Amino acid sequence: YGDATGQARHSSSNVTNWEIVKNTLADYRITNKVPRSNPAERDRVNAVNGMLCNARGDRRFLINPKCKHLIRDCEQVAFKEGSTQIDKKDTNLTHASDASGYMIEQEFSLIRNEYKGLKI
């Protein structure tokens, strides 16, 4: 699971970030689950919040207490004032929550399958 922007080529490199990851893990049975484009940030946040605790009080995503970075992100990441965009000014935050959010949004999306580009 990952950020679709990692598939972009940069003028400073002949390979994408995801090609580097794929080549590094070539000897392992890893399934690459990177979408062609990222989901809307709000959709991803809603999917994560729904897994952490939905309207019925169900908790379907539990975080191991050893996951200090993810816990810190969940406690401190917030939207920009008056916006639906995540505030990313602190470069030490959002990496762990973004990563878990990509997985949750793909596997437990609140949006129908046709949004995700699956052929039915």
Each language-model region and where it sits:
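Mg2+-dependent endonuclease catalytic cores in nucleic-acid-processing enzymes, primarily RNase H-like
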Residues: Y1-D87, L110-I111, G117-I120
